Regions:
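Acidic, glycine-anchored loop motifs typical of Ca2+
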Residues: 1, 67-76, 94-125, 129-130, ...
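Catalytic-core segments of thiol-dependent peptidases
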Residues: 1-22
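Active-site-proximal C-terminal subdomain of hydrolase catalytic domains
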Residues: 15-107
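Extended acidic, low-complexity intrinsically disordered regions
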Residues: 140-141
Length: 141
């Protein structure tokens, strides 16, 4: 609720909020609003294991394989899809049942997330990264 209140001040800007913690799915609905892209490493607050999603989400921005439309820029949607696929593959490779289900919400079936780019120098996405004490990405503003 605190983050939702903080972000309510941004009424004309697009906001990307990435929560890669375990049980981060609980953030999804309170944070969702028009003009926001919310990415969580888990689908629900009940998925409480350590998450692999952040490693792959960050790696996506440095891997040409994540640039699915081959436009030279990796959107938040492309990074999300890349990371989700990598998590699934990692679980399968280890023979584990998939217990981590990343979620993306942007009130438009991924359309806004497909047009927001991070770390590319494009002026349509000047965002900052919030890193927690353990070096994990906890928010992109």
């Amino acid at each position: 609720a605190d983050y939702a209140k903080l972000l309510s001040r941004f009424t004309t800007q697009h906001v990307v909020f990435v929560n890669t913690a375990s049980a981060s799915g609980a953030f999804l609905q309170p944070m969702a609003a028009p003009g926001r892209v919310i990415v969580t490493a888990t689908k629900t607050g009940g998925e409480r294991n350590e998450t692999d999603f952040p490693e792959y989400f960050v790696a996506a921005f440095n891997d040409d394989a994540a640039d699915l439309d081959r436009n030279g820029h990796i959107s938040v949607r492309e990074a999300f899809d890349y990371a989700s696929a990598k998590v699934k593959a990692a679980f399968q490779q280890k023979g584990y049942m998939l217990t981590e289900h990343a979620t993306l919400e942007d009130s438009g079936e991924g359309q806004l997330a497909a047009t927001v780019f991070l770390g590319t120098g494009r002026t349509d996405a000047a965002l900052n990264v919030d890193i927690d004490a353990e070096g994990r990405t906890v928010g992109l503003f």
